[in-house]
């Protein structure tokens, strides 16, 4: 999660409406607890799997850096490495994902969930008072609006962004910079 100037930029949608199905094996069919409600990659069409055994493991955690091994969160035997690295600075957060595969052609979709509606710009996306910069020529960008029933039967809307890339080599790295500019509270909701 990333909050800037009162805006939730990168978000976790929280819990959905509690129903009997929400507490059954159908739980992950609902948007809020599903992998698609979280800012995690989709690898070869496979989302992060559900269950305790499918999770990331922290490799390094310091005041300025966090590295997570995410390979075990995916049920894809061609995926040999997936590490997610966060670097924290005063005015930006840098996110690097490193992928390694058995095969040469793979599909990587960097998936993000935002509270504020993003717009495409020259260097990537503008989200409220934050710019998410990346190499736009590497990705096909798709912005979606998702409305779901949240707690107490209220409708809530978030925006998902899928940045799709067909990887033609066995290794691939992505880099996203969240450049933070605190101007004023966004009205883009």
How should each PLM-predicted stretch be described?
Residues 21-189:
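CBM-like, beta-strand-rich accessory domains located in the C-terminal region of large
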Residues 1-21:
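Internal mixed beta-strand/loop scaffold within catalytic domains of large alpha/beta enzymes
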């Amino acid at each position: 999660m990333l909050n800037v100037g009162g805006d939730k930029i990168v978000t976790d949608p929280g819990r959905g409406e509690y129903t009997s199905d929400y507490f059954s094996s159908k739980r992950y069919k609902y948007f809020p607890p599903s992998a698609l409600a979280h800012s995690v990659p989709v690898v070869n069409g496979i989302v992060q799997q559900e269950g305790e055994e499918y999770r990331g493991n922290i490799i390094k955690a310091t005041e300025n850096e966090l590295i997570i091994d995410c390979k075990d969160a995916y049920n894809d035997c061609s995926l040999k490495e997936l590490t997610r690295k966060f670097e924290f600075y005063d005015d930006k957060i840098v996110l690097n994902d490193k992928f390694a595969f058995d095969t040469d052609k793979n599909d990587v979709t960097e998936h993000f969930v935002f509270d504020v509606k993003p717009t495409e710009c020259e260097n990537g996306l503008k989200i409220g008072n934050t710019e998410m910069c990346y190499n736009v020529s590497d990705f096909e960008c798709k912005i979606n609006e998702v409305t779901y029933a949240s707690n107490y039967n209220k409708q809530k809307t978030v925006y998902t962004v899928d940045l799709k890339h067909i990887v033609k080599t066995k290794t691939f790295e992505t880099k996203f910079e969240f450049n933070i500019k605190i101007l004023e509270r966004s009205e883009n909701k």
